[in-house]
A protein has these predicted regions:
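Conserved alpha/beta-domain cores
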Residues: 1-248
């Protein structure tokens, strides 16, 4: 048996090497579980009024330096111990509209190109339909002869430091959290632990549904609660979040 460890909680970030050691010969690698990790970090800091997070889709791995560093550290630990670093999940689901699938493939490729350049060797997908665009950037980079530098293999170059992400805090972001959470709970009550959800349903434009699971429910609930607890002011409406905030 070979196991890949999902790094999806803040305590796990500080124990990555120890977990590989504990599994010994059964350890295959580490996986960067993006949304679960974001949810875990938010849950640990949500009591602090100085750590009120922006809208969740503004908190990307690429533009949030402390998150990037966590995953670069994951890669370094894997490369140091000859384990396989696995990138995040491409959550787009296939559509009957080919135009939507083409746009999803472009987005997936761009995301996986970034991961490949950080030293990740593989990634995973929510649906096999998108396996090829997710795998292509890793194959191309390796076939080019590119190899991770020695600096990329040293975990000490990537210390863990939790900071507040930058981005907009909007009422629209809160509405999207409420909408997504209600859809997820509906699916969960009907026996589905994961569900394809378009958080912008009813809005102009074409986009794929994304596979959402408990991580989405956790971070959506956490953000709604945090904004109400700290009476955060929305940038788009200049309104204060409170228990009377309603979905329009």
């Amino acid at each position: 048996i070979k196991a890949i460890i999902l790094i999806e909680s803040l305590p796990a970030v500080f124990q990555m090497e120890e977990m590989l050691f504990a599994l010994g010969e059964y350890a295959a690698g580490l996986n960067a579980a993006r949304w679960d990790l974001k949810a875990s970090i938010l849950e640990y800091v949500m009591h602090d009024e100085n750590f009120v997070w922006p809208d969740r889709f503004d908190v990307t791995i690429q533009n949030t330096e402390f998150m990037s560093n966590i995953f670069r550290r994951l890669v370094a630990i894997c490369l140091k111990h000859n384990a396989v670093p696995i990138g995040g999940m491409a959550t787009a689901l296939p559509s009957r509209d080919e135009e939507v699938n083409i746009e999803a493939a472009k987005s997936i490729k761009a995301d996986k190109e970034w991961e490949a350049n950080q030293g990740f060797l593989r990634a995973w997908v929510a649906h096999i339909y998108h396996m090829d665009p997710a795998a292509e950037p890793f194959k191309k980079l390796r076939e080019s002869g590119w190899e991770p530098s020695e600096d990329m293999k040293n975990p000490d170059n990537y210390p863990v430091k939790i900071e507040n992400p930058t981005g907009k805090l909007t009422k629209e972001g809160t509405r999207q959290n409420v909408r997504t959470l209600l859809e997820y709970v509906e699916g969960w009550l009907n026996g589905r632990g994961a569900k394809g959800i378009d958080r912008l349903a009813g809005r102009p434009g074409k986009r794929p549904a994304l596979m959402e699971d408990l991580a989405t429910a956790r971070i959506s609930t956490g953000q709604i609660a945090q904004r109400i607890i700290h009476k955060s002011v929305a940038e788009d409406t200049e309104e204060q979040h409170n228990t009377n905030t309603k979905e329009e």
